Amino acid sequence: MAEKSIFNEPDVDFHLKLNQQLFHIPYELLSKRIKHTQAVINKETKSLHEHTAALNQIFEHNDVEHDELALAKITEMIRKVDHIERFLNTQIKSYCQILNRIKKRLEFFHELKDIKSQNSGTSHNGNNEGTRTKLIQWYQSYTNILIGDYLTRNNPIKYNSETKDHWNSGVVFLKQSQLDDLIDYDVLLEANRISTSLLHERNLLPLISWINENKKTLTKKSSILEFQARLQEYIELLKVDNYTDAIVCFQRFLLPFVKSNFTDLKLASGLLIFIKYCNDQKPTSSTSSGFDTEEIKSQSLPMKKDRIFQHFFHKSLPRITSKPAVNTTDYDKSSLINLQSGDFERYLNLLDDQRWSVLNDLFLSDFYSMYGISQNDPLLIYLSLGISSLKTRDCLHPSDDENGNQETETATTAEKEVEDLQLFTLHSLKRKNCPVCSETFKPITQALPFAHHIQSQLFENPILLPNGNVYDSKKLKKLAKTLKKQNLISLNPGQIMDPVDMKIFCESDSIKMYPT
């Protein structure tokens, strides 16, 4: 039986379904660490068995020299056992921490269930004020968890020079609120750190290290992350003219993907030849002029070809003629034709810095799916659920603002007055205090569906205007005073304005409504 609601809040099952990651992440962490611990135990046990067998062979020689060897072997075995013991103690502490997180989270949601159970027992006599206060406090804590999750994911990791430690505002917020056991911030920080290294530092080492640690899991998922990371490493080596390491990277890390990514490998091979040949053609006295792929991609195709050719050869792109001006070998002819045709479009995507964003999205997708983490921030999910219930067909009309901005310079005085009146009714009446239309939530609300409202609200003093629209009489009179006070429109005494179509009517022309 579902718990009775106090103010239309969702039940416990709803929160559990939306927060499965709070229990799935610790489960994955425990699984990974148990597998790692078992592998270490098997390895060290095998090593101890080998040492024991060697020690037994030494004991067969009953002399002083072999006794010293036996003593050294026993000392080494004791050192290994101590090392295993320290390792196991460390692992046990980490297991206890993870289990304690799960326990705290179960208690957190059990608290919500208990509050709802108390409400069902006190609602008959109306004495539920204490329960209501507890529920509000629970939701305040839960909101802080959502905020901490969002900050941990999206805020950068900063370095404190005084304490010589790294910190994140989301983790600091969670610890200050004593909610750090209710979220796996260490996992989110790892994703944040690798993502920052890709987007802002252009550093592949953290990503490659993470790929090596989770290679088995990525292989089972048939992930292309490793190939794309190694391909980006290869491209970056070519950009700095490090052809030797680029070839080693190609042979060692890219060739194993020849069956699954043959087309991409052909393009990567062509990129090596293309850049090497172009650099050989550069004048020795010239310096690099920069290669802005973002600017080139925004230009037309002929301009792209000219800019790329200009970058590599420091001269204009030659035009195709009916006959070659000079006699060349067969290889030179084919090269000349390719260069004259400007067929560089296929290499632009490889050289584009946008690949870093694509690689980051691919990493986050694999990382979050590995731990069962939602790729969308839980805070934004809750905001979307709430805002979607407020979205109507009158929300989000960008054409109103755009038209006003475009016609400001050429508008006459009369048109300017009409425009000011339109902006006033738009922002002060139609969109006043509307979260859907606010600049803060507009990026979230644009893709949301409209709400399905099946109930209407009646005005306190409804009147029917001649155009068929119904409004509150007091609010129309208040609007008329505001418009005259701000000199937005000229209204005679006893006149009112419809805020939708901005037509002016006399109060005597309106009809008082009596809803039944």
From Swiss-Prot:
Coiled coil: none annotated. It comes from the Eukaryota. Keywords: Cytoplasm, Metal-binding, Nucleus, Transferase, Ubl conjugation pathway, Zinc, Zinc-finger. Its EC number is 2.3.2.27. It is found in: Cytoplasm; Nucleus. Residues 187-245 form the CTLH domain. It holds the Pfam family CTLH. One of its GO terms (molecular function) is zinc ion binding. The record marks C434 as: Essential for ubiquitin ligase activity. One of its GO terms (cellular component) is nucleus. Transmembrane segments: none annotated. A zinc finger (RING-Gid-type) spans 434-501. Its main location: cytoplasm. Pathway: Protein modification; protein ubiquitination. InterPro entries: CTLH/CRA, CTLH_C, Fyv10_fam, ZF_RING_GID. It catalyses: S-ubiquitinyl-[E2 ubiquitin-conjugating enzyme]-L-cysteine + [acceptor protein]-L-lysine = [E2 ubiquitin-conjugating enzyme]-L-cysteine + N(6)-ubiquitinyl-[acceptor protein]-L-lysine. PANTHER family: E3 UBIQUITIN-PROTEIN TRANSFERASE MAEA, MACROPHAGE ERYTHROBLAST ATTACHER-RELATED. Belongs to the FYV10 family. Component of the GID E3 ligase complex recruiting N termini and catalyzing ubiquitination of proteins targeted for degradation. GID E3 is regulated through assembly with interchangeable N-degron-binding substrate receptors induced by distinct environmental perturbations. Required for the adaptation to the presence of glucose in the growth medium; mediates in association with the substrate receptor VID24/GID4 the degradation of enzymes involved in gluconeogenesis when cells are shifted to glucose-containing medium. Present with 784 molecules/cell in log phase SD medium. Identified in the GID/CTLH complex. In the absence of stress, the complex exists as an inactive anticipatory complex (GID(Ant)), composed of VID30/GID1, the E3 ubiquitin-ligase RMD5/GID2, VID28/GID5, GID8, and the RING-like subunit FYV10/GID9, awaiting a substrate receptor to form the active E3 ligase complex. When cells are shifted to glucose-containing medium, the substrate receptor VID24/GID4 is induced and becomes part of the complex, named GID(SR4). This is GID complex subunit 9. The gene is FYV10.
